Amino acid sequence: MINSDAQSAQKQVEVEKPDEKYSAPRLLPPIPDSYQPAKAITKIPATSSLEDILAILERDGGVILTDFVSLQELDKIDEELEPYTKSSIADDDSYNNFIGKKTLVIPGLVGKSDTIANILDTNETIDKLLKVILEERYPAVFEQHTEELVVDPLLSICMGFHVGHGSPRQALHRDDMIFSSKHRPDMKINEVDGFSCFLAGTRITRENGGTMVILGSHKWEHDRRGRPDEVSFLEMERGSAFIFLSTLAHGAGYNTIPGEVRKITNLVFCRGTLRTEENQFLCVPRSKVLKMSPKMQTLLGFKKPAGSWLGMVENEDPAKDLEAIYEKMLK
């Protein structure tokens, strides 16, 4: 049951309209301090079993994994991305009026941070989740037999967000809208089109804009809208990760703390049959792609799935001789 303060907060949010400071209804004023969520996002150790992680994802749509990456790795990421932080934090809303002002966005992180690329290449939890949730196994029916075609998942986008004081909150939304995904209450966890992994580069709190999440919304009907009086707030320590399904309603919170910057690395994955949000073929320097493991080349779409024809070049798997293909392209 929502308490009277929460009801009052909801009423205030409903009647308060975006003013001239907010350029579009995709970016909104903060939720009043008087609102207190009814639920907290579940936290478990990153060493938890895959079964436990999947059970919480199935129930809530998202889960916090503590100590997901080391502080040393985060320090190295900061060092690698430092040259890309010279740009001033945006004074205007960007990315189609969906990334708020006072937010610095660093795109294409695989090509800019070897540490992030290594996390993607070696993290066993991410690897297991990709196989269970997004690996596509399809029974292809031929005239006289049936074959199982396997399509590997892809890295859809990899971005860093440095969110400064005054950055507005996002309207509640689902990430899989970019794929025109349709939702059903009975969707199974291995039927969603994607999932995300937020890495906390700083301590994340409600006050500095921790993501608003509606637990259980991954099981809603497609047309149901999220309301501010339904949200919980993402709060986690540096090094933790928030794993959530692309069907979960959420939105970045409002950073209310002067002088504080919230840092998030956003790793988003999708089915290999979908178009990625970020064009990895043009985001990652060829010098780095050529040195990557087959697993990373697969995740970025440079390697043809073993059980499919997707991604061919000259009727072949491009990963057989990527260097020769690059040379031919440059002629």
From Swiss-Prot:
Where are the residues of the annotated region Disordered? 1-31
Stored SUPFAM superfamilies: Clavaminate synthase-like
Q: Where in the sequence does UniProt note compositional bias of the Basic and acidic residues kind?
A: 13-23
Which cofactors does it use?
Answer: Fe cation
Question: What phenotype has been reported when the gene encoding this protein is knocked out?
Answer: Abolishes the production of swainsonine as well as of the 1,2-dihydroxyindolizine epimers intermediates.
Annotated Polar residues bias: 1-11
**Similarity section:** Belongs to the PhyH family.
What's the subunit arrangement here? Answer: Homodimer.
Function as written in the Swiss-Prot or TrEMBL entry: Dioxygenase; part of the gene cluster that mediates the biosynthesis of swainsonine (SW), a cytotoxic fungal alkaloid and a potential cancer therapy drug. Swainsonine production occurs via a multibranched pathway and is dispensable for fungal colonization of plants and infection of insect hosts. The first step of swainsonine biosynthesis is the production of the precursor pipecolic acid (PA) via conversion of L-lysine (Lys) to 1-piperideine-6-carboxylate (P6C) by the aminotransferase swnA, the latter being further reduced to PA by the reductase swnR.
Task: Write the protein's name.
Answer: Dioxygenase swnH2
Native organism: Metarhizium robertsii (strain ARSEF 23 / ATCC MYA-3075) (Metarhizium anisopliae (strain ARSEF 23))
Encoded by which gene? Answer: swnH2
